[in-house]
């Protein structure tokens, strides 16, 4: 018969191994260690103003990361994302400066972004063209359109009805932070628990 003490140690080792088998566990540990190092280096790291600044920084790229995660797990590639993001922002800004209601301007700018994605999708999925070449070409094209539309200048004098979206607060937390958290949770739930999105893994 085996030694009960050795059997207990083996069972514990199996449990620990099972925990570290999840990539999420390793990522969480890396974040904890990184946070501990940054806190030791700077006492203000874990203060709310600093954490809010970090989350606000993530609120710009965060929604894009969620969409790109779905694309990448399906084996796709899109180099035009950054240019499309800038293009969408400029279109939305110019529309609001021209007097378009903020909600309508946001919808129209999202339609413009969807049009870019639709062209990419049709050329890649339907015409079987190389995604690297297509999205690289689209990146250059959108940058050119952006330069023409904005004429190389920043969009200024945005109305308060538009800027409140990025600067307004609820319970002391700015709106973009809520948006990125909600989108991240929704994206995670879709990838984990819906049949349509889980098919991207296979």
Q: What is the predicted function of each stretch?
A:
Residues 196-202:
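Short cytoplasmic-facing helical segments at TM-TM junctions of multi-pass membrane proteins
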Residues 25-29, 54, 61, 83-87, ...:
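Hydrophobic alpha-helical transmembrane segments
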Residues 30-38, 180-187:
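Hydrophobic core of alpha-helical transmembrane segments in multi-pass integral membrane proteins
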Residues 16-23, 48-57, 99-104, 165-177:
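Interfacial loop-to-helix junctions that mark the boundaries of transmembrane helices
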Residues 100-139:
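Alpha-helical transmembrane segments within multi-pass membrane transporters and channels
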Residues 1-26, 37, 46:
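Transmembrane alpha-helical segments of polytopic membrane transport and secretion proteins
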Residues 32-98, 122-129:
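Single transmembrane alpha-helix segments in multi-pass membrane proteins
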Residues 127, 131-194:
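Transmembrane helix-bundle core of multi-pass membrane transporters
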């Amino acid at each position: 018969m085996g030694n009960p003490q050795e059997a207990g140690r083996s069972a514990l080792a199996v449990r620990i191994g099972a925990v570290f088998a999840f990539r999420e566990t390793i990522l969480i540990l890396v974040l904890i260690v990184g946070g501990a190092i940054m806190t030791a280096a700077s006492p203000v790291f874990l203060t709310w103003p600093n954490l809010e600044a970090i989350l606000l920084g993530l609120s710009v790229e965060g929604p894009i990361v969620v969409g790109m995660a779905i694309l990448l797990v399906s084996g796709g590639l899109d180099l035009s994302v950054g240019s499309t993001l800038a293009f969408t922002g400029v279109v939305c800004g110019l529309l609001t400066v021209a007097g378009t209601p903020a909600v309508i301007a946001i919808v129209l700018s999202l339609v413009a972004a969807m049009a870019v994605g639709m062209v990419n999708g049709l050329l890649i999925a339907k015409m079987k063209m190389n995604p690297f070449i297509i999205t690289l070409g689209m990146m250059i094209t959108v940058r050119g359109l952006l330069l023409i539309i904005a004429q190389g200048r920043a969009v200024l004098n945005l109305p308060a009805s538009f800027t409140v979206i990025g600067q307004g607060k609820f319970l002391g937390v700015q709106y973009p932070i809520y948006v990125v958290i909600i989108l991240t949770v929704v994206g995670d739930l879709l990838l984990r628990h819906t049949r349509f999105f889980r098919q991207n893994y296979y």
